[in-house]
Each structure stands twice: as C-alpha cells, then as structure tokens.
A protein has these predicted regions:
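C-terminal (or distal) subdomains of carbohydrate-active enzymes
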Residues: 1-417
C-alpha cells in the first residue's frame, strides 16, 4: 500500500481488519492484512477508509528472556546461533524440538564435500563438513496486531558476507502458526555443496509422511523400490505423525526434503530413520551431468509450522494447501458507492469434509466446468457440491479427460472407502 496515512480496512459488517506493517520503501509502506472467512471458490472484498492522522509505527522491543509466547506456543531462542532451542505446544502439552539433536530448529546448515565430486559418482559420502551461522546478531522484536517477529542476521559459508543470512521467526497471535523465513545471497561455487534447514522434531514413534500429486506417502514405505528414499519431492506438506498428534510443515519455494537425518550415506536402501527429523534442502549442485556447476544470487524462502491432535490426512492436506497456495489479492480503484461496498460470494464448495477440490477448469466441450476431486482419508462418504447458499448443485461424474462415466446428472455421489 502506498500511503502512510491513518486508515482502516473494513468488511461488510463495518468491522475493521487487523493490519501490520511489513516493510517500508520510498514509495510507501507495505502491510499484512488478516482477512478471515474467505469463501471457498469465491471472493471477499473490503473497503479502505482513510483517516486524518498518520498510521501507527511498528512496535520494536528487545528480545526478553530469549523467548516469545502466545496462547498456543512458547518459543525459546538460542541467540548465539539464531535458532529455536524449544518450541512448546501448550495445547498438546508437548515439547516439539528434539533436545538431543546436533542441530536446533531453524538452523541454517551449509554442507561441503570438500571438493571431492567423485563421491557422488561412487554414491558415497565420506569426505564432507557441515557448518552453521557465525557472528549472529538479533536486531530485536517487532510486535503487531497479527504476529510477533524476531530477526537474526549472521554469516555462513558460501553466502555473501556483507548481505549476510537473514532469518525471521514469526509467531502469530491468534492462530496456531509459526513461520520461518530466510533471505541470503548465494556466492557462485563450483565445488559440490548444499544448504539445508534443520527441523529436528520430537514425537515418540512418529512416522514421516508427505504428499505428492494425488496422494500421501509414508517415507521409505509407500515408495516404488529403488526410487529416491533420502531426498523426497514434497507437494504441500510434510508431517511427523503418531497416534496422538502430528507436526506439520509446508513451504512454497523449496520442494525437496531430506527425511530422517542428515546422511553420511544418502544412497542407502532401504531407507530407515530413528527420529522424525526433517531437513528442507534449499539448494545444491550435487550433479554429475552437464548442468551449470554453480548457483548464485539472492534466494528467499519460508516455511509454515503447526501442530494438532487431528492426525488425519484431511487436516494435513487442508493445512498444506492453505499454507502453500497464496491468497490472490487486488486493490481496486474507488468507484460508485454501490460498487465499492464490501461483499463476499462463494460459487462452489465441497459438501464432504474429506474431499479436496484440486482443480477447476472449463470443460473441453465448452459446456460447464471440469472439477478434479480427491478423497484424502480413504473413508466412505457422500460427495455433494454446494453453491454459496448451501444449495446442492447437479453434476455428472466424469473421468480425468472430462468424458462422462454414465451421463447421469446427480446431486450426490457415494464414495467407497
């Protein structure tokens, strides 16, 4: 947003939304806006109401007792390393970070093969080193109506020292959500190296699962023999899950994760792990083909973390899709009074809680739309499609290409387990 004037953003009932400054530039200040109840497959508009004063400045304080806290989590930081030493879930009564792990939560890990690229051709890792941040500083804490934010800056191998590695931890005020953000400039390096982020979860007897297009995979179990069992490609979420709870991670910029532990033998089969540790793999040049041997430039990425008693794939899928897919927004110019009113509308939603709408496109026939659906928990149910008022909409079951299966128009469809 380009103005520094006092303003409110209000919904159709006149209720003001919470806003929080993110950053300022010469052309103005940018804000985060907390908008709730956005309709599925629809939209919600708000009005911007200007005031006469100036917008409030961000509230900055020092990090006290190395900790942040809200109704859901208590975070204890290690300011010397710019990491999280403890993440305690108050609802579950659980510590989420493994205290015995070599790497704390959020640790920025640089890995080098010490110039020995032939290890990859021999499929062994026996000559390597790993390091984390040095010269770490904490500029302080920013508190707002949406979240509290702690920033750390430090230096790392393979990264521009002047720019540094910048880490931000956000603890949201009213939802069970923690975010980790990273910003650094990668220096060109032809020797084999990689960068990871550490997420050493503590959850007894937990299995690591992740979703791929069309389903959920248990790491090392539900995979075709011989496929990658160390670095997995993740679509929307990774979950550390046992019978009582699950810890969830989602990120939009980094699709590769090493699940289990940082490996000395990443090509080992079959893949097993003792603890549910997760390592997003930010970047690497571990290849032996004729791709460019170095990577360089600024790189930004982020991860969303949550935890819940609900151990279903449905809960994990809803979290992952919501966290990874951005909410599209537009600022519309002022118009007539009627057109500028706040409003909302939903065109379509699923009437079955464990059915996910994965895509919606115009049908090739030019008549209607083709909706791709996925049942997430292997449960029986009744599929219905509802409009904004909750009225059941007629539909025809079709295959993936849009060809009708039987041609009948129905308002419900029985789902088999």
């Amino acid at each position: 947003m380009l103005f520094r004037s006092e303003f409110r953003i209000v919904d159709a009932a006149g209720k003001a939304l919470r806003v929080q400054p993110i950053r300022s530039r010469r052309e103005g200040r940018y804000y985060a806006i907390w908008a709730e109840g956005i309709p599925a497959m629809g939209y919600k508009t708000f009005e911007i109401v200007l005031g006469d004063g100036k917008a409030a400045e961000p509230r900055r304080t020092e990090l006290r007792n190395n900790s942040l806290e809200n109704d859901f989590y208590r975070i204890v930081f290690d300011p010397a390393s710019g990491t999280i030493a403890s993440l305690y879930d108050k609802e579950l009564g659980r510590e989420m970070v493994d205290p015995d792990s070599e790497w704390k939560l959020g640790a920025f890990i640089y890995e080098s093969l010490n110039g020995d690229r032939h290890q990859m051709e021999r499929k062994v890792f026996d000559n390597y080193r790993r390091s984390s941040l040095s010269d770490v500083h904490c500029p302080g804490v920013t508190s707002g109506d949406i979240y509290q934010s702690v920033r750390f800056t430090g230096k790392a191998e393979g990264c521009d020292e002047k720019f540094g590695v910048q880490i931000e931890v956000r603890l949201y005020n009213d939802v069970k959500r923690v975010e980790l953000g990273y910003d650094f400039i990668r220096k060109p390096e032809t020797d084999p190296s990689a960068i990871y982020v550490a997420m050493p979860w503590l959850l007894e007897n937990a299995k690591l699962t992740f979703d791929v297009p069309g389903g959920v995979v248990r790491s090392g179990e539900d995979q075709i023999p011989g496929t990658s069992a160390s670095w997995n490609t993740v679509q929307n979420f990774v979950a550390a899950r046992n019978d009582d709870a699950q810890i969830l991670v989602s990120g939009s910029e980094v699709p590769l994760y090493l699940l289990g532990k940082l490996l000395d033998d990443p090509y080992r089969q079959p893949r097993t792990y003792e603890k549910p540790h997760v390592f997003p793999w930010l970047m690497n040049n571990y290849w032996t083909t004729n791709f460019r041997a170095s990577q360089e430039g600024e790189f930004k990425c982020g991860f969303v973390i949550s935890s819940t008693r609900d151990t279903s794939n449905t809960a994990a899928s809803q979290f992952g899709w919501s966290a990874r897919i951005p909410l599209c927004t537009r600022v519309m110019p002022a118009a007539t009074a009627a057109n500028g009113n706040a409003r909302d509308r939903s065109f379509l939603r699923s009437g079955c809680s464990h059915v996910l709408i994965t895509s919606c496109t115009p049908a090739a026939s030019g008549e209607g739309i083709l909706i791709n659906l996925r049942e997430t928990d292997g449960q029986a149910g009744t599929l219905t499609l509802l409009d904004g008022s909750g009225r059941e909409l007629p539909f025809t079951a079709a295959d993936a290409t849009g060809r009708p299966l039987d041609g009948r128009s129905v308002t419900s469809l029985a789902l088999k387990p």
